[in-house]
């Protein structure tokens, strides 16, 4: 993707606005997961090392727009950043009409969603944000699918607009996996409902050589293959769609393999006993909650031969130990595979972390909705405007 990158520019003495995704979970005024802060740190440190005057901008939660609400303040993030960087990062509440930042200093601007017009991609607000800096750096991949004032309008009106290191790395990884993938290409799509990932399943089934489905999504395909699913979560109105996707994949020379065995339980509960059954032997009062060991072996064989793996969603209810063995086996297979592996989505990342293979996945995306929309083939507004700005020079 042809976008100007922060690494292409001389930042010394320049006012550099870094739009990051610091939308972290909070409890009792404390950050409970600093994953997004850690992901942004290299970009911040790079800008500071280059002698920039750094302004950080981010949203947090969903406050009422145009109103200050201490429950959605970035104050806990400023504290966390100060500890991580080793110096005080002041939180500035009134910044929209201009702010003085010294060379080598970093300030955090208060929640951009407190500003009226942010969500509507307001042009006037975009111009004001753009006027705060000499260089606008869009680095928030997690918000790149939203056309908002701080991710879109400001990019349009900034003197210079570019992609930050984190966004650039995301785009490089996604392009490598989707634009010119090493073959065979394997997709793994899990989750509870086909309806939420129908576009993704449709897009990937035409692109990949094999499409592994898991979780509640797989139950629709099991049903479409003529097997009973008992009391399992599935969507009866989408069984025909699952059959169509399997037929379309076959017609294109690919495959959506159906599990040969599954792990069932009487209910989805921590105390529920787990039983392995052939997929053709699921009883009416049972729920499918994981793939079985034979299926895990088949999927491992597929993944070990892959050139590219794109993964979104677990294949079982891995939050309950006895229904997590399939997802664990899949994690190990992706980690062991020589393929370029790209994973994204909250549950997928949680599984990768739980089973200790973070360092063995080629790239883990920081985006949720943005990752899915990119995989679906949709244009991300923040990326599109960066490409437009770059093409005009």
Swiss-Prot record:
Single GO biological process annotation from the record: glycolytic process
Listed GO MF terms: ADP binding; ATP binding; phosphoglycerate kinase activity
Entries under InterPro entries matching the protein: Phosphoglycerate_kinase, Phosphoglycerate_kinase_CS, Phosphoglycerate_kinase_N, Phosphoglycerate_kinase_sf
Catalytic activity: (2R)-3-phosphoglycerate + ATP = (2R)-3-phospho-glyceroyl phosphate + ADP
Compartmental location: Cytoplasm
EC number(s) given by UniProt: 2.7.2.3
Residues binding ATP, per UniProt: 197, 319, 345-348
Keyword vocabulary terms for this entry: ATP-binding, Cytoplasm, Glycolysis, Kinase, Nucleotide-binding, Transferase
Pathway: Carbohydrate degradation; glycolysis; pyruvate from D-glyceraldehyde 3-phosphate: step 2/5
Keyword Transferase found: yes
Domain of life: Bacteria
Residues binding substrate: 21-23, 36, 59-62, 113, 146
GO CC annotation, single: cytosol
Pfam family, one: PGK
Subunit (UniProt): Monomer.
Assigned protein family: Belongs to the phosphoglycerate kinase family.
Protein known as: Phosphoglycerate kinase
Species per Swiss-Prot/TrEMBL record: Nitratidesulfovibrio vulgaris (strain DSM 19637 / Miyazaki F)
Gene: pgk
